[in-house]
């Protein structure tokens, strides 16, 4: 009987050790929220952001990464992007779940510049690769750091880089 108890205790300890060392799959909790976030960007469904983001959502976009701290500013950013690029689309290429509070997404964005934005519409299509680090807490998105090549994007729209010494002549 003593051997059975010792053997059972040993098996229980080994089982607990293996279970506690297993990496948790955060994707099952986070993927549905990410899919709704992508819906906001890809379809312009801004109301869904009320459900999945915190009021003080912090958006940081290159090159300055200056914080825009509010859900309303996020909605404005998405709305302005979709106004300038009505067919704007984010395609997720890869997801790396860091923890239950952060995921890194590698993506490709595409869009045709048909609407007014920071410049008159060019009618040209552009695409760029980039990545986002998206942060979570208690089942809601709390922020995103977003990076891509602005230069790649604007060159595809037909903009040219002019060195300062040429502009001065």
Language-model features: where?
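Exposed beta-sheet edge and beta->alpha loop/turn motif
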Residues: 108-141
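A short acidic/glycine-rich loop-to-helix N-cap element
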Residues: 24-25, 118-123, 152-160
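A solvent-exposed, acidic/Ser-Thr-rich amphipathic alpha-helical stretch
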Residues: 46-99
């Amino acid at each position: 009987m003593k051997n059975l108890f010792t053997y059972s205790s040993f098996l229980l300890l080994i089982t607990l050790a293996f279970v506690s060392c297993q990496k948790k799959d955060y994707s099952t909790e986070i993927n549905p929220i990410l899919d709704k976030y992508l819906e906001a960007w890809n379809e312009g469904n801004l109301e869904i952001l009320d459900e999945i983001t915190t009021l003080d959502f912090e958006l940081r976009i290159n090159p300055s990464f200056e914080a825009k701290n509010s859900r309303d500013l996020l909605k404005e950013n998405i709305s302005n992007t979709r106004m300038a690029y009505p067919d704007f689309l984010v395609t997720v290429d890869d997801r790396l779940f860091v923890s239950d509070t952060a995921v890194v997404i590698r993506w490709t964005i595409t869009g045709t510049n048909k609407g007014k934005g920071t410049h008159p519409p060019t009618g040209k299509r552009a695409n760029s690769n980039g990545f986002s680090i998206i942060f979570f807490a208690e089942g809601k998105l709390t922020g995103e750091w977003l990076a891509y090549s602005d230069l790649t994007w604007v060159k595809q729209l037909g903009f040219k880089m002019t060195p300062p010494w040429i502009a001065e002549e």
